[in-house]
Amino acid sequence: MARVIDKEEKRCDIALSAITLFCEKGIQQTSIDQIAKSAGVAKGTIYLYFKNKEEIVFTIWDILTQQHEEVFYKRINPNMSAKEKILEYYNFSECQEGFDKEQTLILFQHFVSSMLIDKTSLYTDYFESFFKKDYDFITKYLYEGIENGEFVIDDVELLTNSIIMLLKGALIKAKASNMGFDEAQQILTKHITYLLEQCTRKVL
């Protein structure tokens, strides 16, 4: 008997089938017809699961984000410092498992590009909520570092926003310099480490 696929699983399958298209053609240049063909479904079926192409894009990112968070919480432990936890949060090495890591980098770059030219506020609103999660996470562990005597920070909000801006800048730098995933990851880790060391003072 054929396996029953629930609606959410089918929705995820359709969204994930669009990754290669988005990476090769770009989000703006990819049509619903092409996504339907890639997913092996009729165009009308796409609209049973998604209102528009943007929902497909956001579903992909929700899937990647959920996977990243699950892996992160498995990797950390109570003995890790706040600095180590922040660096681990921005370690995207699990992209090698289940997803093509180079495609993941290209996809994120396309996401940011779409946000920059967005006139509908759909991308802007989505990524605002996405970076808000990053903000809350970084702030949590910076204060944890303060409380456990790991370091002293003059301005937690400024440091938090600087780390988030660094992530965006690293994506643009990777694109401009034609970096692969591994090199981009090394650059991101190096600069976040430097930023944390320069903007925190160890408690004496």
Show which residues each predicted segment covers.
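Basic, helix-initiating cap at the start of DNA-binding domains
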Residues: 1-25, 29-41, 55
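An amphipathic alpha-helix adjacent to DNA-recognition modules
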Residues: 8-16, 28-29, 49-73, 87, ...
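Helix-turn-helix/winged-helix DNA-binding modules
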Residues: 24-27, 48, 77, 148
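Short hydrophobic/aromatic patch on the recognition helix
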Residues: 40-50
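Hydrophobic alpha-helical connector segments
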Residues: 59, 73-103, 159-163, 185-189, ...
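Amphipathic alpha-helical packing segments from all-alpha helical-bundle domains
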Residues: 69, 74, 119-148, 157-161, ...
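Amphipathic alpha-helical segments used for helix-helix packing
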Residues: 85, 98-122, 172
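Amphipathic C-terminal alpha-helical segment
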Residues: 95-99, 140, 144, 160-182, ...
